[in-house]
Amino acid sequence: MPPPASSVDFSNLLNPQSNPTESTPSSPATPVDSSKGPSTPSSAQSTSSMASSVSLLPPLMKGSRPATEEVRQDLPRPYKCPLCDRAFHRLEHQTRHIRTHTGEKPHACQFPGCTKRFSRSDELTRHSRIHNNPNSRRSNKAQHLAAAAAAAAGQENAMPNNAGALMPPPSKPMTRSAPVSQVGSPDISPPHSFSNYANHMRSNLGPYARNTERASSGMDINLLATAASQVERDDHFSFHAGPRNHHLFSSSRHHGSGRLPSLSAYAITHNMSRSHSHEEDDSYSHRVKRSRPNSPNSTAPSSPTFSHDLLSPTPDHTPLATPAHSPRLRPLGSSDLHLPSIRHLSLHHTPALAPMEPQPEGPSYYSPSQSHGPSITDIMSKPDGTQRKLPVPQVPKVAVQDMLNPGSGFSSVTSSTANSVAGGDLADRAF
């Protein structure tokens, strides 16, 4: 029969010590079944050679496990759970089981910014591999969260409070059964998370890092006002300031936030707006003084806003006697008369500035009707270079004989003028 022949060949391959002439190799297979255990009683009862040969594999794979379980069942279980009826061989197993009832998780992850805790040390070990593997997607997400939390923790631990005492360390117990991660300050990150460390340091060194993080936590409302005013000043300064008008703009940037519509309006409300600017500076400096000495705002270089009194070309005690180079006010009316005629007319034709020009309080010290010749401004404004010459002084036309004869009817003023013009020694030569 072909099937028994194939079964005999297969049994010979599995059991080379058996006699190949035997037609029923079930006899060597039955001791194996009986020795391995009672898990496969059907193989011992089977009379088919194919079934007996194939049934050799399951006892080899399954026979050892029930034996070990029986051995473990025989061990004593002295450690019983007080909350349930379970008992354990070792004290560690009982302690780990009791934590499932109480919810205690003493094993905390020491990675900067990670707040997870575990009741078993092997769970903490498995969790720490997430931080140690930079290629994991969970690791990347956890690193971003850890960087933000580490920055906040570093801010709170690095800065002292207003009383001068250091803040207490975070209340995390350091007791754990497996030394997996580093124990130390949250500012120190492991070498594998250099990007987190760089982000953390960058957020610490940034001038507004404390304002944004502390404002998000809602601890101090004054920090919101400080950050808002600082951002507004910086935005306005970056829009208007340049290398050419940095000196001029630093003196007038207090009024550049859209509060005053025009320069002429500022000319009328000059004293009032300047007093408001000082009140604004005082309130802002008061908020700065209330902040901690280690804050980035107090250590940052001072902006041109705070050098208002030093860089201002116009002193505060002379609001009406503004010099001509001041960027805040236009020159007074008396100085406008020195301008050329076309510029003089263009200034007075401006409808918005004409009624708002400040007028001098005292009498005019200069009258254009007193000048008979061309002014210096007219000479310098001529396009032709040959015409830019000073005129020759107009000397009274007096003949030499009249100058030599003082008694010919000239007055003393004329003779004195002639003597001064001619040199004063012509009369002496004549006599």
Swiss-Prot record:
Name of the protein in its database record: DNA-binding protein creA
UniProt-annotated location(s): Nucleus
Main function: Transcription regulator component of the regulatory network controlling carbon source utilization through ubiquitination and deubiquitination involving creA, creB, creC, creD and acrB. Represses the transcription of the alcR, alcA and aldA genes by binding to a GC-rich region in their promoter. Also plays a role in response to carbon starvation and the control of extracellular proteases activity.
Region feature (Disordered): 1-74, 272-337, 352-431
GO BP: any one term: carbon catabolite repression of transcription from RNA polymerase II promoter by glucose
Basic and acidic residues composition-biased segments: 276-285
Family in the record: Belongs to the creA/MIG C2H2-type zinc-finger protein family.
InterPro entries registered for this protein in UniProt: creA/MIG_C2H2-ZnF (IPR051007), Znf_C2H2_sf (IPR036236), Znf_C2H2_type (IPR013087)
Keyword set includes DNA-binding: yes
Pfam families: zf-C2H2
Feature: compositional bias, Low complexity: 16-31, 38-61, 293-307, 405-422
CC annotations in GO: cytoplasm; nucleus
Listed GO MF terms: RNA polymerase II cis-regulatory region sequence-specific DNA binding; zinc ion binding
Zinc finger (C2H2-type): 79-101, 107-131
Modification after translation: Ubiquitinated. Deubiquitinated by creB, probably to control its activity or amount.
PANTHER family, per database record: REGULATORY PROTEIN MIG1-RELATED (PTHR47428:SF1)
Organism: Aspergillus aculeatus
